[in-house]
């Protein structure tokens, strides 16, 4: 960092750091911690049984077999439908499978009385009892079944999904109850969904009742049971194929053994290096279609699935499941699947499993209770007593969360009190940021101007000591010291920008308020501003290549700013000067256009500040010359 070349190299390193940082924090390695993996040993009966299921696709017969149903013969003509409408939800229920068949979310009022718009992009019109609602469907039109399975290969399509349940409505208490008896008449399965009009939570109670005169081993280490809670979450594009950027927005998560973990949904959770090791060692004997994570001491605290703007969480209130299943099959939609291995019922006994379930936006105001009577932290009589205190980790963005939340709050206030457009809010925010850090930015501008003034002397040094790098470095530093120039004086503003950049990325990637926000020609500030898309290119891309105008403008301002502040440099330094914009173009090409807009306007402001500094310096020199 002792000359211009080093400063340019630092800028390159910082750009690469941003690139790697974004990949690390927001597209994490899908491998999970080794200490939560189920050990494939003969002493672990659960894992042994799981291995048998994976390799054969079948399970051993148990004392309480799941329903054996000829799926192709099932006809839904007797299926009953029912709806529950709350302040936030429209939920459709079906007696076939005793499940939620569709789950819609509509605009709702936040805990502070603010309107939170959910149905912002391509909403569906849902009619219930003659009243129309605009809402977004979150189950990918496949519903949430909350049904058991004793086979891994059937976890996303349980045999119970083909059983007709009896359906009972309780309009007063906003609840729906389902009941069905196993084909062998040995037990009964009951489910009750209870909603609360003002809240974004609902309660699910599952009951298993032993009808037989003998003990019923519903779940054991030898014959585990899998409960699928929430499948893969929506919404997702229906008018085009999913891109890599789209799939990176879907994830599944769980809190196990005191540690929060998440992996990409619809893809493998097997670590990259494990896959590489298997490739080189030829270890193809282990079927990695599924993996089970367990913790015998504390169990699963909660589990769920998420999309770009929404999450769905199932939190066991009165028990701790043994583990969680991770489906590694490509494009799977299994979602969050819990593992049970210790459910034993005496004759006539009723075994209950209670869950608090949240479906909503990935924001704290979505998870906040409006009525303190329902908040378990404020009321001992809350129906959600036992709710995990770590539930907020399901939408936490890590170390950048405070920056992200602060930026979102500032943008909302600017939106509220100035121009109600988030594009202008970003520009005003960029101006405010520039004003707050004006002393540092001015120091950078002064440093650049001084280095420009030294350009002829630097050129002489470079030419004179072209073959002696050590002496060239020494003379350069002597020149800087003599003229009181700090070659790294302009680095700090760039370093400060990094957390802002990452926070802006997260803000525009998963904040519901900024979803589908237009600005000038930009249709959606949360997406790249594609103004034209090429036709599909065979063997290269099926969706074509988009032309992103704002990213090109950003690079243009970056090049102009660099040339404006450049000093005498050798060919290698010139090459670095042009490599940097290419790197930036690569980084920003698929960024949310809101982030690119912010960076572009920061460049424009920096160009303006540098021009004013240079102009004032020339004016001052002319005055001194006259004197």
Curated annotation (Swiss-Prot):
Q: What is its main location?
A: membrane
TM ranges: 8-28, 417-437, 488-508, 536-556, 575-595
* Pfam families, A to Z: 60KD_IMP
Assigned keywords, A-Z: Cell inner membrane, Cell membrane, Chaperone, Membrane, Protein transport, Transmembrane, Transmembrane helix, Transport
**GO cellular component term of the entry, any:** plasma membrane
Where is the sequence biased in composition, kind Polar residues?
33-57
Residues annotated as coiled-coil are none
Q: CDD domains recorded for this chain?
A: 5TM_YidC_Alb3
One of the record's GO molecular function terms:
membrane insertase activity
Which residue ranges does the record annotate as region Disordered?
33-68
Q: Where in the cell is it found?
A: Cell inner membrane
Membrane topology designation: Multi-pass membrane protein
Question: What's any GO biological process attached to this entry?
Answer: protein transport
Basic and acidic residues bias (residue ranges): 58-68
- Cross-referenced NCBIfam families: yidC_oxa1_cterm
Subunit structure, per the record?
A: Interacts with the Sec translocase complex via SecD. Specifically interacts with transmembrane segments of nascent integral membrane proteins during membrane integration.
The UniProt entry's sequence similarity note says: Belongs to the OXA1/ALB3/YidC family. Type 1 subfamily.
Described by its record, this protein's role is as follows:
Required for the insertion and/or proper folding and/or complex formation of integral membrane proteins into the membrane. Involved in integration of membrane proteins that insert both dependently and independently of the Sec translocase complex, as well as at least some lipoproteins. Aids folding of multispanning membrane proteins.
Full protein name: Membrane protein insertase YidC
Give the organism the record lists: Leptospira interrogans serogroup Icterohaemorrhagiae serovar copenhageni (strain Fiocruz L1-130)
